[in-house]
Amino acid sequence: MSLYPSLEDLKVDKVIQAQTASSANPASQAFFLNVVDSAAFPPGGNLYPKLYPELSQYMGLSLSEAEICENMPVVSGAPTQGQLVARPSSVNYMVAPVTGNDAGIRRAEIKQGIREVILCKDQDGKIGLRLKSVDNGIFVQLVQANSPASLVGLRFGDQVLQINGENCAGWSSDKAHKVLKQAFGEKITMTIRDRPFERTVTMHKDSSGHVGFIFKSGKITSIVKDSSAARNGLLTDHHICEINGQNVIGLKDAQIADILSTAGTVVTITIMPAFIFEHIIKRMAPSIMKSLMDHTIPEV
């Protein structure tokens, strides 16, 4: 079963497959040519002139043939037998004729499974990390920019399963911070589950440059009817954590809007249910989130 980063990709891929199947079946076309009066054909001789929509204008998207070929090279010609098409790491199962090889999707990808990171304290004895207890688990509340925690790829919402081999289940926030404070500074080993409360939604801007949602204080409040946001299942009462992999927590709405407007035609946002988000950031001043939170664009 094929997987797609967005509904637009699924629909366009179906159109491409149907057009390819039609052009690759001359026997079928010959049969219809024998039974249908050629005088009934529309100008240009196309048997099915409006059976499938033109890809240049589809679902509110502007898709020229050049853009399709650039984002999905396989469309321009079928691969020869045995030829492998290189695709990016863990998203290689995605079929993306519209989205293509988008860096934002790769930066925002939530990886399933558990990983281990090793970090050390800086010259001040810090690792640039704040933790929060949620439902008997320990979660990342804050990652400071250019800190050891940031350099090993920790993100807001990551779940910490172990610190130096000790299970964190049932710990309080204070105990987690105490263990980190007392840990040997040269090597701290942490076992991490990647952002279990978060999910990503990939959308495509329409001709006016919008994806179709309204937010206030970083929280999604409304979805525009028939927009890409609506088609791809974006929900209200969710907080925006990242845009194309860039953390936007603590930023003003105008700053978030600017990041959205300057993003490309494909926008992938990472969201978290509001009640969980608000619990994680509880007792953390907005000024701390704005000034200390790592808002850099991650490398891919």
From Swiss-Prot:
Residues 2-104 are annotated as: Interaction with PDCD6IP. It is a peripheral membrane protein. One of its GO terms (cellular component) is plasma membrane. A motif (LYPX(n)L motif 2) lies at residues 47-51. Keywords: Acetylation, Cell junction, Cell membrane, Cytoplasm, Cytoskeleton, Endoplasmic reticulum, Lipid-binding, Membrane, Nucleus, Phosphoprotein, Repeat, Secreted. GO terms for molecular function: cell adhesion molecule binding; ephrin receptor binding; frizzled binding; growth factor binding; identical protein binding; interleukin-5 receptor binding; ionotropic glutamate receptor binding; neurexin family protein binding. A motif (LYPX(n)L motif 1) lies at residues 3-7. It is found in: Cell junction, Focal adhesion; Cell junction, Adherens junction; Cell membrane; Endoplasmic reticulum membrane. SUPFAM superfamilies: PDZ domain-like (SSF50156). Pfam families: PDZ. A motif (LYPX(n)L motif 3) lies at residues 51-55. The modification Phosphoserine is found at residue 6. Residues 116-195, 200-274 form the PDZ domain. GO terms for biological process: negative regulation of receptor internalization; negative regulation of transcription by RNA polymerase II; positive regulation of cell growth; positive regulation of cell migration; positive regulation of cell population proliferation; positive regulation of epithelial to mesenchymal transition; positive regulation of exosomal secretion; positive regulation of extracellular exosome assembly. Phosphorylated on tyrosine residues. The keyword Mitochondrion does not apply. SMART domains: PDZ. A 1,2-diacyl-sn-glycero-3-phospho-(1D-myo-inositol-4,5-bisphosphate) binds at residues 252-253. The keyword Protein biosynthesis does not apply. The modification N-acetylserine is found at residue 2. Signal peptide: none annotated. Multifunctional adapter protein involved in diverse array of functions including trafficking of transmembrane proteins, neuro and immunomodulation, exosome biogenesis, and tumorigenesis. Positively regulates TGFB1-mediated SMAD2/3 activation and TGFB1-induced epithelial-to-mesenchymal transition (EMT) and cell migration in various cell types. May increase TGFB1 signaling by enhancing cell-surface expression of TGFR1 by preventing the interaction between TGFR1 and CAV1 and subsequent CAV1-dependent internalization and degradation of TGFR1. PANTHER family: SYNTENIN RELATED, SYNTENIN-1. Monomer and homodimer. Interacts with NFASC and SDCBP2. Interacts with PTPRJ. Interacts with SDC1, SDC2, SDC3, SDC4, NRXN2, EPHA7, EPHB1, NF2 isoform 1, TGFA and IL5RA. Interacts with PDCD6IP. Forms a complex with PDCD6IP and SDC2. Interacts (via C-terminus) with TGFBR1. Binds to FZD7; this interaction is increased by inositol trisphosphate (IP3). Interacts with SMO. This is Syntenin-1. It comes from Rattus norvegicus.
